[in-house]
A protein has these predicted regions:
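Gram-negative/organellar outer-membrane beta-barrel architecture
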Residues: 1-152, 182, 212-225
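Charged/polar, low-hydrophobicity segments characteristic of intrinsically disordered regions
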Residues: 48-51, 170-171, 202, 206
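Transmembrane beta-barrel strand/turn architecture of Gram-negative outer membrane proteins
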Residues: 81-84, 149-159, 164-198
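Short helix/loop capping segments that flank catalytic or ligand/cofactor-binding pockets
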Residues: 98, 142-144, 161-163, 198-199
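Extracytoplasmic gating/loop element in the C-terminal half of outer-membrane beta-barrel translocons
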Residues: 179-225
Length: 225
């Protein structure tokens, strides 16, 4: 169980959650989280069951709800709720496949200070996506690796959607022991993500890709530069 609060250059945040790898003693992974900041509320519930029905497959499901209120600063507000269900299994040695079905309902509202492009996107959206990931993992340890590497490719494909965007993400990491006596490990990583509209229209603001905050140094969250 975790509970945290903080104040910084990006504003104040309070949050908490429960993370358990053996929930009820049944090997169930449970991850719940709630985060409240000055302009957003984010909540999620993730349940995963390794070796589901003795098949060596991991079954996972999640429920999420977010509110991003930028009416005072950028003229828009986004409210999102959704759920997903999927599985992950080892297709070949060190190669994992993780298909997922994701449904999201979104409401986008604007005010007079919003840009013309945001005003054009105002409305309600229903998105039904098929997402999948390919993971090639040769790390010697998933928690604190000292050698090997991991390659991850994720793609999000619209099945039924008000807008049609495809998102591709690639993550690569490589680990190498630099000094065994001092337990010094070197890491090199690469992150690439792109969202493209199938009909050439502007990508919806909630679908636009951003660099994850934990991969940036020297920047304020939600700012440019």
């Amino acid at each position: 169980i975790s509970l945290a609060a903080g104040v910084g250059t990006a504003g104040s945040t309070i949050g908490g959650g429960i993370k358990e790898k053996n929930f009820l003693g049944k090997g169930i992974n449970l991850d719940t989280n709630l985060e409240i900041s000055q302009d957003s509320i984010k909540g999620r519930f993730i349940y995963s069951k390794p070796n589901f029905n003795y098949t060596d497959n991991t079954l996972f499901t999640s429920i999420k709800s977010t509110t991003q209120d930028k009416l005072s600063s950028s003229g828009y507000k986004i409210t999102t709720a959704g759920f997903s269900i999927g599985t992950q299994f080892e297709q070949y040695e060190n190669l994992f496949f993780s298909p997922e079905i994701d449904f999201t309902q979104e409401d986008l509202t604007t005010n007079s200070s919003a840009s013309s492009s945001f005003k054009k996107q105002e409305g309600s959206y229903s998105d039904f996506y098929f997402n999948y990931g390919l993971i090639y993992d040769t790390r010697n340890n998933s928690f604190k690796p000292s050698k090997g590497g991991a390659f991850v490719f994720n793609q999000e494909l619209p099945l039924i959607s008000t807008d049609n965007e495809i998102k591709n993400t690639i993550r690569m990491s490589k680990y190498k022991s630099l000094n065994q006596s001092k337990n010094m490990i070197g890491k090199a990583s690469l992150y690439f993500s792109a969202v493209n509209s199938l009909d050439g229209s502007d990508v919806r603001i909630s679908k636009r890709t951003i660099i994850p905050y934990n991969r940036m140094r020297g920047f304020e969250k939600g700012k440019i530069g």
